[in-house]
Swiss-Prot record:
SUPFAM superfamilies according to UniProt: Cysteine proteinases
Name of the protein: Putative ubiquitin thioesterase L96
GO BP terms, alphabetized: DNA-templated transcription termination; protein deubiquitination; proteolysis
Sequence ranges assigned to domain OTU in this UniProt record: 606-745
InterPro entries for the chain: OTU_dom, Papain-like_cys_pep_sf, Peptidase_C85-like, Rho-like_N
Function: Hydrolase that can remove conjugated ubiquitin from proteins and may therefore play an important regulatory role at the level of protein turnover by preventing degradation. May be involved in TIV genomic DNA packaging in a manner related to the Gag polyproteins of the mammalian viruses.
Keyword list, A-Z: DNA-binding, Hydrolase, Protease, Repeat, Thiol protease, Ubl conjugation pathway, Viral genome packaging, Viral release from host cell
Compositionally biased region (Polar residues): 565-575
UniProt key word Hydrolase: yes
Top-level enzyme category: hydrolase
Catalytic activity: Thiol-dependent hydrolysis of ester, thioester, amide, peptide and isopeptide bonds formed by the C-terminal Gly of ubiquitin (a 76-residue protein attached to proteins as an intracellular targeting signal)
A GO molecular-function descriptor: cysteine-type deubiquitinase activity
Species per Swiss-Prot/TrEMBL record: Tipula iridescent virus (TIV)
Coiled-coil segments: none
Amino acid sequence: MCDIDLKTCEKSSKYKKKDIVDLGKKCGVDPYLPNGREKTRQVICTEIVNQYSTNPPSSSSESDDDEDMGKQDQDPICGISEKECNKLDNVNLLALGEYCGVDIYTPEGNLKTSKTICKSVSLKQSSPKAQKSPNKNDLINMDPANLKKLAKKLDIDWKKKDIKELQYLIAKKLNSIKSVSPSRSPSPRRSRSPSPNIQNMKKKELKALAKALGASDKKLDKMDKNQLIEYILSRKKSPSPVRKSRSPSLRQRSRSPGRSRSNSPVRPKYRAADLLGKKVVELKELAKMEGLKKWKDKTPSKMLKQDLVDFLLHVGGGGQLPKTPSPVKPSASPKTRAELALLKVPELKAMALSYGLKNFKDKTPSQLRKNDFIDFIILSTQKSQSPPPSIRSKPRSSSPKYKTKDLVTTDESDGEIVVKKITRKPKSPRRSPPASVRRSRTPSVPKSPSARPRSKSPSVRAEITDDEGETPPSSVRPKSPSVRPKSPSVRPRSKSPSVRPKSPSARPRSKSPSVRSKSPSVRPKSPSVRPKSPSVRPRSKSPSVRPKSPSVRPPPPDPSNSPSITVDPSVTPPSSVKIKKRPELPEYKGGNADRDLEILARRRGYKVIPVKGDGNCLFRAVGKSLRLNQNIKYSHEDLRAQVVTYLTSHKEFLEPYLEYVTESGDTTPQEYAKNVERYIKNISKPGTWGDFICLRVLSEILKVKFNLLILNTRNFQVISNNDTFKPLIPLGFIDDYHYTALTPLYAEPIAVLENETPTPSIAPSIRPPPSIIPSIAPSVRPSIAPSVRPSIVPATPSIVPSLKPSVVPKLTPSIAPKIPPPVFGPVKPLSSTRELLEEADKVHPYVREDISQLARAEEQILVSLGM
């Protein structure tokens, strides 16, 4: 049967796989692989045919010993042909290479190809067998050349030695080798394929190996290749489990009865890599099967995964504990909430117990749930991280709040000071633009000459009127109020309270408590009182209390009187001269910028049209203003595209703005060209903030001027590329980061000069003031007839005065004076009672001023009449 044909054995339906396995056993072929699995039918048939072809039945009289020696010399498994070896699958191929003692790994640690492994197997099988070691007679009969070769193989120094010495040294060396070497050569199946060198492995493979040994992903990301190698070497890997024997027949054949072996050490039951790849629940079940009750003073419920692995390795390894790192106590902040949520409840419970958990939320550890354990762990880590409590300063006492408005008058003066109710408003969050955008968007506006340096101890100022006679809103309440009058000179403030002498024109103040209004950014620590001066200085940043004047809404200013900024694109500054950067706008210190701009625009006769702040606000504001004021429709995409097209075809337009276009500071032509392209590319992207260069380009394209109302300076500024352009497009500008559209409140705006005269301290009434001259009859008949004497006039004295007036007063004819009709602007509809009360509060002090002026005029009329 062993002389079966290969084709019949492989493909005949007469024989099943079981029959082929039995046939292989009968013919002396092992049908099992080293791992215990059966070989494929094709491999078994090939080995049977090869076995029969190499050892055919012989009729010659050969001894049984010679047959046995021939069988031992020829290995049927390793004698497989390369063609048949290449057809094997990966599992059988690896088993074949390991069985035949062939290196299946490259020096870099990678697996060799199937073709390379098969070639190595065939070469090893076809290599000549090792000869017997020469005996003493062979050494005597050996020629000197062969003696030298043999000495060289045995690492014997053969130089300067004669033949007898070489024979003696070789014989001595061979005897020592025979005494150390085992009595028989090891079986081929005992040779193990060398493991890949860890130094030659790639970082990706090292990470996978370290992860299998229990390293976390977070730890692996921070480790380089050398640290990975150190970590893998520090984790002592347990040896592989016992390999299954190929077959019972081979097992019996390998153990000869006459030869005794030394007892090999017991191999461990568990491998560290296998245990670390299992879950905690599976490890606990294995530990219970091994009889776990307590380990390292911990019960199974308190043990972590590493404790369970150490226990199983200790039990299965014959009492030898591998060098695995002990469980580290959690640090101050071991894991985040998300990482803790990935852990199992037993692990969380063990971690919480390590932090000293006894009772949490009136529950014992056995009653707590997963979220409770996570809360306790995070709370414990926060306590360990929290610094010692610091001494906190007590909050400042708030200043008194005034619920109503009162009038404070002086002893000798008829002037009145308004006490304003101060309410704290939260600051509206404002986005701060990037430095590059902030620099490029700032219009060239110099700082106001009236800006005063801030002192360390600011005191209260009298409220200073701007060119509209109104006070800008603010958001900070003063701590201790005081009154500071108007003064044209700028004086540094002192750190201590001081009282300054009154000017000759100032009237004495009463000793009643003074109140000031809000300060925009700081709280005064010490009050100071200053006299009132008749002159009025320009508005400063710190508003204070002042006598209010009637709210007369001035019309928008005449753009012809405003300074326009004209740029000639043909003028190019020399490349050697570096242009100085223009000053930044003064920082806005108000509370709500949008609300303040609405108030400022309403005083100037404009209405604010909100614009979406998405980076396209400049183009959106220009488009809205064109549609509302000039009835021209443009979308913000169209305007941006026109700017990009114009700058692409007129790159010389950007030459006057080298400092804003050049980012690197280099003004060479090559660098300038790169920066121009970069600037145009950035502006072409939707959402990129526009700047004043875009405004000038739009002015040139649309042939218009832009009247920019800047909140920081509270003034208009005309931006244009040519003074000859007539249409004026109003825009609002907030704190160097946002543009809005404006539309006039009046149908025909009245031109007003930019340099407006200061608002008088006593606002004009709708009636003309009376012209009063003593001893001359008034031109206007008094409201009380002379025949009816008022109660405030004393009776006529009984003694006739000796002096008589030179001009006898006469009654004025009953002709009504010609009073011009009042002019009222458009009335804004009120939406709530609150707005009505606010308007009434604004008018109230002015009405009282008018009444007091009328009372004084009446008194002077009576005095002039001698009454």
